[in-house]
From Swiss-Prot:
InterPro entries: Bles03, TIF_eIF4e-like. Residues 1-10 have a biased composition (Low complexity). Residues 41-50 have a biased composition (Basic and acidic residues). Belongs to the UPF0696 family. It comes from Mus musculus. Disulfide bonds: none annotated. It holds the Pfam family Bles03. The lineage of its organism: Eukaryota, Metazoa, Chordata, Craniata, Vertebrata. Residues 11-25 have a biased composition (Gly residues). Residues 1-66 are annotated as: Disordered. This is UPF0696 protein C11orf68 homolog.
Length: 298
């Protein structure tokens, strides 16, 4: 749980430190603070990687070129640096969760604040931390340095290469991604995920606020170790048990930290798995596909 919790706050800003167990990156020396509206207190908050989410969204006009990727990364960096709405189960009674969810539904919390929305100031992300949230970091700086060296070495860049880099530098966390349009379904899905986090069935999660230009919002649900297939599948099952029926995709954080997006020059697929809801015939509630090998896992 520690690694996933750190990833939620994770770095991507070039932060990181020495080895350490688990697979999460450190948030760049805690350069910013996450605002918790629970109890009207500002709490020290760890960040998620700035590139991780917006690059997963459909790009404007269907574009997926370098300019678009850089623009999305910049937008995500800005979101990472702004205050967050955080429900921290380590310091806040679980009995307060329903009121918090009702006060800050993600379809109504706006990215830059609005007099008619629950927030008058900018909000970067909305997050739920489980009781087991324990910051832990991998060596993101070492990972990025090794990546730069690899690119200039002339050696092949393959999924196996990136997997080994992640293992070597203890950057093993990853996340299931859930994309939904603003509205009741999004709010209902986030409420189910947040409850699962607070009750200990999931570890830690975040959701993006509503953008000014509209478009889908995204929920990220973290796991400690993308190489632990059983753990990844267990998280998928918990997400389905929380009532989520839409398509899920799973992305290791190593791709995020190294800035590898869709339509990249190495022709790498940054998402390892996809999960589709299945009604009946499967007690898990979903069918999970290994995208790289085109093999069904469940």
């Amino acid at each position: 749980m520690a690694a996933a919790a750190a990833a939620v706050a994770g770095a991507g800003r070039g932060g990181g430190g020495g080895g350490g167990g688990g697979g999460a990156a450190d948030p760049g020396q805690e350069r910013s603070r996450a605002r918790s509206w629970v109890g009207a207190e500002r709490s020290e908050g760890r960040r998620m990687e700035p590139n991780e989410e917006l690059e997963e969204e459909d790009s404007p006009g269907g574009r997926e070129d370098g300019f678009t990727a850089e623009h999305l990364a910049a937008e995500a960096m800005a979101a990472d640096m702004d205050p967050w709405l955080v429900f921290d189960a380590r310091t806040t009674p679980a009995t307060e969760l329903d009121a918090w969810l009702a006060k800050y539904p993600p379809s109504q919390v706006t990215r830059y604040g609005d007099p008619g929305s629950p927030n008058s100031e900018p909000v970067g992300w909305i997050a739920a931390y489980g009781q087991g949230y324990t910051p832990n970091s991998g060596d993101v700086q070492g990972l990025q340095a090794a990546w730069e060296a690899l690119q200039t070495s002339g050696r092949p860049i393959t999924p196996g290469t990136l997997r080994q880099l992640a293992i070597t530098h203890h950057v093993l966390s990853g996340k299931w991604l859930i994309h939904l349009s603003p509205g009741f379904k999004l709010d209902h899905a986030w409420a189910g995920i947040a409850r699962a986090v607070v009750e200990g069935r999931l570890q830690v999660a975040k959701v993006s606020p509503r953008a000014k230009e509209g478009g889908r919002q995204v929920i990220c649900v973290y796991t400690d170790d993308f190489t632990d297939r059983l753990g990844v599948l267990e998280a998928d099952s918990a997400i389905r048990a929380a009532g989520i029926k839409c398509l899920l995709t799973y992305k290791p954080d190593v791709y995020t930290y190294l800035g590898i997006y869709r339509a990249n020059r190495w022709h790498l697929c940054p998402t390892l798995y996809e999960s589709r809801f299945q009604l009946g015939g499967n007690t898990r509630g979903s069918r999970v596909l290994d995208r790289a090998n085109n093999v069904e896992l469940t």
